[in-house]
């Protein structure tokens, strides 16, 4: 009993000694002048807070030029207003941490490594990144897969990379031009991302193999890639699902890179690198091994970007998906795209993908591209099942002719070589509405599907369109009720 009392007393003393340990990085030698490399000082402050059992590392106003920053358990990194962590350029002698080994080849390079990030952590818990400051990767963080700079030191291709962590909070920060990913979060459970702004080159927020995640009140602009995307890849070496995820009250867009943060929201660039229009959407997929379950997306706005995409093509089961109260404006492809494919980037003998139990309601879309309609597609012998779309209004641009359909005028050539070679309906292709070609209907095009219910649907076009409203192919039990 005496030993227990003594331990309790020591615990109380520890809590009194470190109730809110706060360490200013300037006391560790950081300059914040935009010229001096400050990552050693920031890492020293993080390490001291970690050794003390936890605390807050504070960055006051200034520009902190940095290479790799190593996050630690029980440590909060707080950037005050005017504080900027800026990615430092690689030199002949200085650079970022090397990308670690990952022996699983079923996902892209970018999804396979975390150490080659501006800020990274692995096997951590209770990590917080917060404040009114900025993470700036302008002209430094790579948009591609290059691992090393021209002179040898490693380059970084993302702002934040976290693997196998829990109880992570990212709140209030702004991420600008952050390379391949602003946030790559793989195997991170009990995750909260709130009030974050991303205005970036490629993917904004990537949540991969995560459980119990909330993304709330975020603005993500990503012309060249997806804004908020859920994945369930094989990057951890096993098919961990992404489940119990809530995305709510977010805005996604495909404006010119940098124009969301500066307030201009310009649209001079009308195409992403794949040849389609601006990306900037919310998506599930494409990496899809472990499964998508219990996902809720609600009260979100899409502007000048692609529509909602729900994709499983690598063997994942997608079920219990709930989507509601979306507003979309100026949508450059399908407002709604549900795709069950057969790409199968997975170990040999992996099970086929499945889609069921999807409920979508209260969707309002204006200015949508008519070429690809709202598109639901399974594959022969493996249909999309049990989808309900209710109370959906879509105003398409129209203007497509039957000759356009026959000749596939305006079809994106980026996908044509694969589409001609890989299976009926391109089932092994990268899933994208334009990979299916211009659809034979302008409202809904549904193939290889069963038990699909379209309730209280209102569809119209701005310009006359020669195609019918609906096209069904190899379907069973399709029910439609239209609202005039």
Which positions does each model-derived feature cover?
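Bacterial N-terminal signal peptides that target proteins for export
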Residues: 2-12
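Extracellular/periplasmic carbohydrate-active domains that bind, remodel
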Residues: 21-484
């Amino acid at each position: 009993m005496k030993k227990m009392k003594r331990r309790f007393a020591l615990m109380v003393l520890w809590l009194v000694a470190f109730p809110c340990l706060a360490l200013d990085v300037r006391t560790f030698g950081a300059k914040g002048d935009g010229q001096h490399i400050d990552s050693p000082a920031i890492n020293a402050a993080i390490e001291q807070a970690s050794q003390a059992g936890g605390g807050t590392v504070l960055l006051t106003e200034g520009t902190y030029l940095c290479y790799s920053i190593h996050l630690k358990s029980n440590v909060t990194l707080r950037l005050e207003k005017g504080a900027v962590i800026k990615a430092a350029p690689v030199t002949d002698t200085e650079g970022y941490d090397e990308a670690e080994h990952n022996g699983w080849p079923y996902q892209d390079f970018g999804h396979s490594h975390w150490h080659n990030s501006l800020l990274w952590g692995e096997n951590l818990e209770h990590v917080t990144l917060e404040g009114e400051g900025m993470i700036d990767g302008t002209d430094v963080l790579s948009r591609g897969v290059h691992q090393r700079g021209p002179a040898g030191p490693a380059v970084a291709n993302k702002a934040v990379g976290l693997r196998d962590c829990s109880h992570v909070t990212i709140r209030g920060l702004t991420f600008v031009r952050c390379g391949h990913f602003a946030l790559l979060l793989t195997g991170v459970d009990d995750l909260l991302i709130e009030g974050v702004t991303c205005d970036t080159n490629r993917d904004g927020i990537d949540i991969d193999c995560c459980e119990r995640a909330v993304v709330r009140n975020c603005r993500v602009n990503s012309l060249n890639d997806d804004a908020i995307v859920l994945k369930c890849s094989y990057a951890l070496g096993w098919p961990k699902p992404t489940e119990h995820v809530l995305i709510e009250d977010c805005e996604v867009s495909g404006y010119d890179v940098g124009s969301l943060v500066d307030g201009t929201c310009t649209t001079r660039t009308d195409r992403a690198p794949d040849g389609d229009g601006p990306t900037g959407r919310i998506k599930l997929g494409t990496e899809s091994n472990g499964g998508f379950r219990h996902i809720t997306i609600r009260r979100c706005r899409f502007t000048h970007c692609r529509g909602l995409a729900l994709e499983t093509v690598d063997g994942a089961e997608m079920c219990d998906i709930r989507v509601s109260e979306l507003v979309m404006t100026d949508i450059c492809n399908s407002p709604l795209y549900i795709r069950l494919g057969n790409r199968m980037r997975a170990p040999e003998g992996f099970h086929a993908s499945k889609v069921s139990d999807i409920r979508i309601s209260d969707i309002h879309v204006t200015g949508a591209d008519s070429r690809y309609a709202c598109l639901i597609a399974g594959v022969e012998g493996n249909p999309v099942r049990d989808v309900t779309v209710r109370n959906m209004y879509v105003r398409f641009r129209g203007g497509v002719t039957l000759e356009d359909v026959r000749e596939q005028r305006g079809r994106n050539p980026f996908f044509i070589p694969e589409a001609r070679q890989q299976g009926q309906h391109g089932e092994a292709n990268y899933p994208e509405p334009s990979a299916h070609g211009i659809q034979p209907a302008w409202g809904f095009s549904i193939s290889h599907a069963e038990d699909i219910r379209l309730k209280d649907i209102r569809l119209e076009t701005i310009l006359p369109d020669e195609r019918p409203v609906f096209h069904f192919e190899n379907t069973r039990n399709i029910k439609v009720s239209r609202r005039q």
